A protein has these predicted regions:
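12-transmembrane solute porter fold
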Residues: 18-34, 39-40, 97, 268-436, ...
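Extracytoplasmic
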Residues: 2-7, 15-74, 124-125, 129, ...
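Transmembrane-helix exit segments and adjacent C-terminal regions of multi-pass membrane proteins
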Residues: 2-4, 9, 13, 446-508
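Short hydrophobic/small-residue motifs within alpha-helical transmembrane segments
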Residues: 63-65, 154-155, 323-324, 419-420
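Hydrophobic transmembrane-helix bundles of small-molecule transporters
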Residues: 169-284
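Interfacial helix-cap and linker-helix signal at transmembrane-aqueous boundaries
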Residues: 45-47, 77-79, 110, 162-172, ...
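A membrane-interface helix-boundary motif in multi-pass transporters
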Residues: 169-182, 231-241, 343, 430-468
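Helix-loop-helix hairpins in multi-pass membrane proteins, especially solute transporters
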Residues: 74-213
Length: 508
């Protein structure tokens, strides 16, 4: 065991040991901040390139799907390439995508660049966080590691649009965030190149048995699902031949994914990974989190823009409020598990309760003269509950699945939470809002368009309240038990590498 402060083995000796993990934490933060087209720049991109809102959303969803797909490959990369090689490649690839996406108006090309950027930013983030995991928790405790990890991951989800919109407001150009992130990523590459050296803790494993085609098929399957719900309102759902063709492709792609999973030796997701008894209920809970989290994307945006007439800068403060909620939720998970020593599964009930508070409060707050400050508490509570769910469900997933299937399980959870469920709920809310508006107008109510919109939004928030309260009652009546009485510990990288070597038959 190393004596003294934690040390990153790949750093050169002149870098202070106490500073080394903080540098990697900064790298992870920069990777997570990066992307292709940034959500905070949506309106500017739409205006400059004359794109539809659905086009820009689809580009962003390509990036989100790209983030979900590398998990089954991550350890194979870690045990073949050095830390220095992985960070250099990830930083340069994401920087290149950020640069190139500024100079094309082709939506398909922007989608591809966004997907590649998402894929490699996850690779860079994993390499940083896996390197400093013993600094974060010397006891290899997942109930410490995941809350701290999600402080950065979820924090960046809300901090990125906040930073983006402020930069665009100051410089009046949506490309400023791409320039900033390109510069930051090139700085990461320069620091890695100058201050690190190649270090291996074991002999490299051959870079084989990677199901690239399976990764592409599962990605296409997710994106076809997202396309249907993103463009559904625009093309009038199944009345359009484009939507009919998309449904047909979705069915065919799903068939090929399943057939390939059962008929090759090393599939992208192994069939055994789907057979755990509690996996399906767990994925349903991930879907519920996405359902509750999708309400701000349609209803809150329609309310703040269509009823209150707030601009982007005014509503941007809500991103900061949600950032504080996410950090508070992750730290509360640490407090619950490590100070109060309570079962992590009981936190799920608290998470449901705080998430349900959001639509309940919004239902009663909807008013044409509402101040922006009135939205702080419901947004904080929603983000707080969302963070609790993400932390504890990931711990539960890790407890449910052995380590060889855990990263496949993260991709399976990503199939639910990284885009598809969010797109489906947003599409259904958009359809519901249009349907409510048409119904209210046909009833001849003595209201103008703004009041009819407000009434429609309140009705949909009411439906969301009923669903959320029903789920909360289920959690109050059903005591979710941990998978085992004592939590598993993180395995050491040497142990994981030897297991992979033995499994693939590389050992002599």
């Amino acid at each position: 065991m190393l004596q003294g402060p934690f040390r990153v083995p790949s750093f050169n000796g002149y870098i202070p040991r106490r500073l080394q993990p903080w540098i990697y934490l900064l790298f992870a933060f920069i990777f997570l901040m990066s992307g292709g087209i940034y959500g905070g720049a949506m309106s500017q991109v739409m205006g400059e390139y004359s794109l539809m809102r659905e086009d820009v959303l689809m580009i962003i969803m390509f990036n989100v799907v790209g983030v979900a797909m590398p998990f089954p490959f991550l350890f194979k990369m870690k045990f073949h390439f050095t830390n220095r090689q992985l960070l250099l490649n990830a930083a340069l690839v994401v920087a290149t995508c950020n640069f190139l996406i500024m100079w094309t108006d082709s939506v398909p090309l922007m989608c591809i660049l966004a997907y590649i950027a998402g894929f490699f930013k996850l690779c860079g983030t994993f390499e940083c966080m896996s390197t400093i995991q013993l600094w974060m928790t010397s006891k290899r405790d997942f109930t410490i590691f995941f809350p701290l990890l999600y402080c950065i991951v979820l924090g960046n989800m809300f901090l990125s649009p906040w930073v983006t919109e402020h930069l665009i407001y100051i410089y009046q150009d949506w490309r400023i965030i791409n320039w900033a992130m390109t510069g930051a990523l090139l700085l990461v590459a320069l620091i890695v190149y100058v201050t690190t050296h190649d270090f291996r803790f074991m002999k490299p494993l051959p870079f084989i048995s990677l199901d690239y085609l399976g990764c592409i098929l599962w990605s296409a399957w997710m994106l076809e699902f997202i396309f249907f719900f993103t463009y559904g309102e625009h093309y009038n759902w199944l009345d359009s031949k484009i939507m009919q063709m998309d449904v047909l492709l979705f069915i065919l792609t799903g068939y090929f994914c399943i057939q390939r999973m059962f008929h090759i030796r090393h599939p992208y997701i192994e069939p055994a990974a789907w057979k755990y008894k509690r996996l399906i209920p767990l994925l349903i809970l991930f879907a519920f989190v996405e359902f509750m989290g999708s309400t701000p994307k349609v209803l809150q945006t329609a309310f703040t823009g269509g009823v209150l007439h707030f601009g982007n800068i005014t509503t941007n403060v809500l991103n900061f409020v949600e950032w504080t909620g996410a950090i508070a939720g992750c730290l509360f998970c640490l407090f619950w598990c490590k100070v109060l020593h309570q079962k992590y599964t009981r936190l799920l009930t608290i998470g449901v309760a705080t998430m349900v508070c959001y639509p309940v409060m919004m239902y009663f707050l909807i008013h044409p003269g509402l101040n922006i400050e009135a939205l702080y508490l419901p947004c904080f509570l929603r983000s707080f509950g969302n963070a609790i769910f993400f932390c504890m469900l990931t711990v539960y997933l890790e407890e449910l699945m052995p380590f060889q299937h855990f990263f496949m399980g993260l991709t399976m959870a990503g199939i639910i939470r990284n885009g598809p469920m969010s797109a489906m709920c947003s599409g259904l809310y958009s359809f519901g809002l249009r349907h409510q508006m048409a119904e209210n107008m046909s009833r001849g109510l003595p209201y103008d368009a703004t009041n009819l919109l407000m009434l429609s939004i309140r009705n949909l928030y009411g439906i969301t309240c009923l669903i959320g309260i029903a789920v909360l009652i289920i959690f109050l009546l059903w005591d979710v038990q941990p998978v085992r009485s004592t939590l598993k510990k993180m395995p050491s990288w040497n142990f994981v590498g030897k297991r992979m070597k033995k499994k693939k038959g590389f050992a002599k």
